[in-house]
Each structure stands twice: as structure tokens, then as C-alpha cells.
């Protein structure tokens, strides 16, 4: 079955092409740390031959606590992104939270991301669609895979069909997430075979029901990522940090930066194997 290709500059993203890595850090903690992390990703992905898009947030507008670190903000964040692009020649993905942010952010980065908690906000979707940028839509934890076609349709009505879908798990009772591996193929089907990627970092989140910060299951990142890659996906979304225990956001779910290369070697091996299989139709 023909898969839709979404191009991010010279990077082609599709379910039947070699996977693209969307990776970086959760939130911009400082200019120097962003440079350090981006440089490591670029070095490793170039060594392994993996297409790469750098990810970071300039503002975490949905933190659980009012006291949690949010990021440097729009103006300073765009300056850091511009320096990363000029220094390393990378493509960049970041999220927006308000309609007014869509165009200023799209003027700097290559992919703008619709956060899971905001994925049904029509005003935000319309503003993002109007930019003409490539869009990454995070599937809300409370939305079934089959409902994602409605969000894609909103973007199409807004004149933008350059949409990537991203799964980051589904609510499983209170304060826990699980990933339905059958959901990936459903998302492909309802979106006209749009590229589907897997955010393994945020799928590992779990919470202290009375705490102010998210916990995580970093020790299981490789096994969950291997399971997702075995489905046959357009890309993998992963956040890493040189010192996860002291990261300012989602450290418990972050991959230790030093483990990036061996982790990606495993992901590439699985992706190469799965996409070397002949398509098998078991529906009839």
C-alpha cells in the first residue's frame, strides 16, 4: 500500500522509508546545553546514517506545577534555534501552545508540533495550518487512534496536508500510560497513510498521584522503543540528557545521552529488518 511522504527539506518521512530520528532535549535549559546535546545527536546520527531533526521546547506551558521551569520563552528560544541551525545545519522541531505563536515559530523552525493536550483546539490547528509548515500532531492520551483522522481533516481543511502523527501512549487508569501497538496501523489507515512516529520518552511517564512532577520508567526505554520500531514506523521521537537526574523537565523518562549511540544502533537494526520484509496482507 502506497505510503504518504512528508518532506522536511531534504529529509523524506514515510512509514516505508528508513526511520527519521526526532530527538534532542525536553526543554531548552540553556544555550550551552542545547549546543552540547545537539552536537552529540548530530555526530551519532551522521555516524549511523540516520536522518535527524533536533527537538526542544522553548516554553513548557503545561507543567503540572506553577513553580516548575518552563523554558527561556519565545524570543530567546528562537535565537537558540537559529544558532543551532547555523552551527550544525540541523532541521528543528518545536511545539506551540497559542495561535499567536504559530507563524513566528514557523519562520524559524522546520516542523511545528501540536501538543497532545491541545490537539483538538481548532483555533490553534487553523493557525498552524496557515503557516504551511510541516506539522507533527501528538495523539492525546485521551483520544483513540481511530479519532486521529478528524484532526488530520482539520489541517486539510486549513490547506495543509503536510502532517505527521505521533503516538505517546494512552491513559491506563490514573497516572499511568500504556502503548497500544495495534494503534499505529489504525492511525496510518485513518490518516491516508500519513507518516506515524512514536514518542517513546513521554510514553514512559508515570506519576505520583499527589506529586507536582512526572515520574518515568527510563530503565524500560530500550524495550519499549524496540517494540514500537518492530511495527514499522516513519520515525522515533526520543529525548536525552547528559544528567537525567538533574534535568529541569521529564528527567525520569530521558535517555542518558551517553547511551544514545548503542540505543540507536538497536533501533536501526530493527528498522532495517522490518522494512526488508515483504508486505503481508492477512485480512483475507
From Swiss-Prot:
Does the keyword field hold Transmembrane?
A: no
Q: Would you name any one GO CC term?
A: cytoplasm
Compartment(s) where it occurs, according to its Swiss-Prot or TrEMBL record: Cytoplasm
> Does Transferase count among this protein's keywords?
yes
Main subcellular localisation? cytoplasm
Instruction: Tell me the protein's name.
Output: 2-dehydro-3-deoxyphosphooctonate aldolase
For this UniProt record, give its keywords in alphabetical order, as a comma-separated list.
Cytoplasm, Lipopolysaccharide biosynthesis, Transferase
PANTHER family annotated for this entry? PHOSPHO-2-DEHYDRO-3-DEOXYHEPTONATE ALDOLASE (PTHR21057)
Disulfide connectivity?
none
Q: Which GO terms describe its biological process?
A: keto-3-deoxy-D-manno-octulosonic acid biosynthetic process
Leader sequence residues: none
Q: What pathway, per the record?
A: Carbohydrate biosynthesis; 3-deoxy-D-manno-octulosonate biosynthesis; 3-deoxy-D-manno-octulosonate from D-ribulose 5-phosphate: step 2/3; Bacterial outer membrane biogenesis; lipopolysaccharide biosynthesis
Q: List the catalysed reactions.
A: D-arabinose 5-phosphate + phosphoenolpyruvate + H2O = 3-deoxy-alpha-D-manno-2-octulosonate-8-phosphate + phosphate
Enzyme class comes to: transferase
What does the sequence similarity comment in the record state about its family?
Answer: Belongs to the KdsA family.
Its encoding gene is what?
A: kdsA
What EC number(s) does its UniProt record assign?
2.5.1.55
Identify a single GO molecular function assigned to this protein.
3-deoxy-8-phosphooctulonate synthase activity
Amino acid at each position: 500500500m502506497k505510503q504518504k511522504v512528508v518532506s522536511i527539506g531534504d529529509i523524506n518521512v514515510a512509514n516505508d522509508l528508513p526511520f527519521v530520528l526526532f530527538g534532542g532535549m525536553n526543554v531548552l535549559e540553556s544555550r550551552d546545553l542545547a549546543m552540547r546535546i545537539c552536537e552529540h545527536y548530530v555526530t551519532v546520527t551522521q555516524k549511523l546514517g540516520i536522518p535527524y531533526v533536533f527537538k526542544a521546547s522553548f516554553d513548557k506551558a503545561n507543567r503540572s506545577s506553577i513553580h516548575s521551569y518552563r523554558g527561556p520563552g519565545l524570543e530567546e528560544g528562537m535565537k537558540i534555534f537559529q544558532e543551532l541551525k547555523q552551527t550544525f545545519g540541523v532541521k528543528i522541531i518545536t511545539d506551540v501552545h497559542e495561535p499567536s505563536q504559530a507563524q513566528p515559530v514557523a519562520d524559524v523552525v522546520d516542523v511545528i508540533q501540536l501538543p497532545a493536550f491541545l490537539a483538538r483546539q481548532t483555533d490553534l490547528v487553523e493557525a498552524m495550518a496557515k503557516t504551511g509548515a510541516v506539522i507533527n500532531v501528538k495523539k492525546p492520551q485521551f483520544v483513540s487512534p481511530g479519532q486521529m483522522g478528524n484532526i488530520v481533516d482539520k489541517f486539510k481543511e486549513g490547506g495543509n496536508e503536510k502532517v505527521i502523527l505521533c503516538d505517546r501512549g494512552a491513559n491506563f487508569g490514573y497516572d499511568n500510560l500504556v502503548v497500544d501497538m495495534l494503534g499505529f496501523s489504525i492511525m496510518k489507515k485513518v490518516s491516508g497513510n500519513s507518516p506515524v512516529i512514536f514518542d517513546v520518552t513521554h510514553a514512559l511517564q508515570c506519576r505520583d498521584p499527589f506529586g507536582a512532577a512526572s515520574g518515568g520508567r527510563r530503565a524500560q526505554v530500550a524495550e519499549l522503543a524496540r517494540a514500537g520500531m518492530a511495527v514499522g514506523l516513519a520515525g522515533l521521537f526520543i529525548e536525552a540528557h547528559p544528567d537525567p537526574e538533574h534535568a529541569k523537565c521529564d528527567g525520569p523518562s530521558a535517555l542518558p545521552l551517553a547511551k544514545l549511540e548503542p540505543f540507536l544502533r538497536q533501533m536501526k537494526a530493527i528498522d532495517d529488518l522490518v522494512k526488508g520484509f515483504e508486505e503481508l496482507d492477512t485480512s483475507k
